[in-house]
């Protein structure tokens, strides 16, 4: 009988120990699962944290590139030198002078072929004048109109050939005319013996000619101030 009681106690103790061991194993497995889930969540949050700053960096890079493009455009506008600009200006003036010849001839020929070939009645006077003189005057007027529009046509053709430098030339035109207005003489002081030297600076085609233009303006001022004395 005592042996049976001892055996029962031993069996109960062994069963309790096994159940406690299984409980400990279950709790440890739960803790392992919770720690692994925490590690996974922390790693995902860290990945999100490292990815999120990339968009501001991209925007800042794009903004810096856009800001750097504006100084480059300003440098392109200021790339045209004064010597090159004055050469282009001289070629533009030459183009206007050259195209004046064909426009004048074409206008005169067209007007003459029309007005001078009309059948006229000499007895029908126009405003008291012979119709022949009226038609001749109209022919001359059309010829003069062709001479006037010649520079406009030449400048338009020249502008089409230099479209790539249009903005730079326009800026240089503005700066050049500001120089001319600031340094040219007062035209009210001119006389027959002392005319104004190139008031608009149209003949300036180089830096050397611009310096000569400045000397001519100074000579005009001296003559106007000292009674038309001969400039030494």
Curated annotation (Swiss-Prot):
<feature type="transmembrane region" description="Helical">
    <location>
        <begin position="140"/>
        <end position="160"/>
    </location>
</feature>
<keyword id="KW-0812">Transmembrane</keyword>
<feature type="transmembrane region" description="Helical">
    <location>
        <begin position="96"/>
        <end position="116"/>
    </location>
</feature>
<dbReference type="GO" id="GO:0001405">
    <property type="term" value="C:PAM complex, Tim23 associated import motor"/>
</dbReference>
<protein>
    <recommendedName>
        <fullName>Presequence translocated-associated motor subunit PAM17, mitochondrial</fullName>
    </recommendedName>
</protein>
<keyword id="KW-0472">Membrane</keyword>
<comment type="subunit">
    <text>Component of the PAM complex, at least composed of mtHsp70 (SSC1), MGE1, TIM44, PAM16, PAM17 and PAM18.</text>
</comment>
<dbReference type="InterPro" id="IPR013875">
    <property type="entry name" value="Pam17"/>
</dbReference>
<comment type="similarity">
    <text>Belongs to the PAM17 family.</text>
</comment>
<dbReference type="Pfam" id="PF08566">
    <property type="entry name" value="Pam17"/>
</dbReference>
<keyword id="KW-0813">Transport</keyword>
<comment type="function">
    <text>Component of the PAM complex, a complex required for the translocation of transit peptide-containing proteins from the inner membrane into the mitochondrial matrix in an ATP-dependent manner.</text>
</comment>
<keyword id="KW-0496">Mitochondrion</keyword>
<keyword id="KW-1133">Transmembrane helix</keyword>
<feature type="transit peptide" description="Mitochondrion">
    <location>
        <begin position="1"/>
        <end position="40"/>
    </location>
</feature>
<keyword id="KW-0653">Protein transport</keyword>
<keyword id="KW-0999">Mitochondrion inner membrane</keyword>
<keyword id="KW-0809">Transit peptide</keyword>
<dbReference type="GO" id="GO:0030150">
    <property type="term" value="P:protein import into mitochondrial matrix"/>
</dbReference>
<keyword id="KW-0811">Translocation</keyword>
């Amino acid at each position: 009988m005592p042996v049976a009681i001892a055996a029962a106690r031993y069996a109960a103790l062994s069963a309790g120990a096994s159940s406690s061991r299984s409980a400990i194993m279950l709790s440890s497995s739960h803790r392992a699962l919770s720690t692994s889930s925490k590690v996974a969540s922390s790693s995902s949050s860290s990945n999100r944290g490292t990815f999120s700053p990339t968009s501001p960096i991209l925007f800042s890079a794009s903004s810096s590139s856009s800001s750097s493009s504006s100084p480059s455009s300003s440098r392109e506008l200021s790339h045209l030198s004064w010597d090159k600009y004055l050469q282009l200006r001289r070629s533009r003036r030459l183009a206007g002078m050259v195209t004046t010849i064909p426009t004048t001839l074409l206008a005169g020929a067209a007007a003459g072929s029309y007005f001078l070939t009309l059948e006229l009645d000499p007895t029908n006077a126009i405003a008291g004048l012979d119709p022949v003189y009226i038609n001749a005057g109209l022919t001359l007027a059309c010829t003069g109109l062709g001479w006037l529009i010649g520079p406009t046509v030449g400048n338009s053709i020249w502008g089409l050939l230099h479209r790539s430098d249009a903005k730079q030339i326009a800026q240089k035109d503005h700066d050049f005319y500001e120089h001319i207005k600031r340094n040219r003489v007062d035209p009210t002081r001119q006389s027959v013996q002392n005319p104004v030297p190139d008031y608009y600076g149209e003949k300036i085609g180089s830096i050397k000619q611009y310096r000569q233009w400045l000397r001519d303006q100074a000579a005009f001022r001296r003559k106007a101030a000292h009674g038309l004395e001969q400039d030494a």
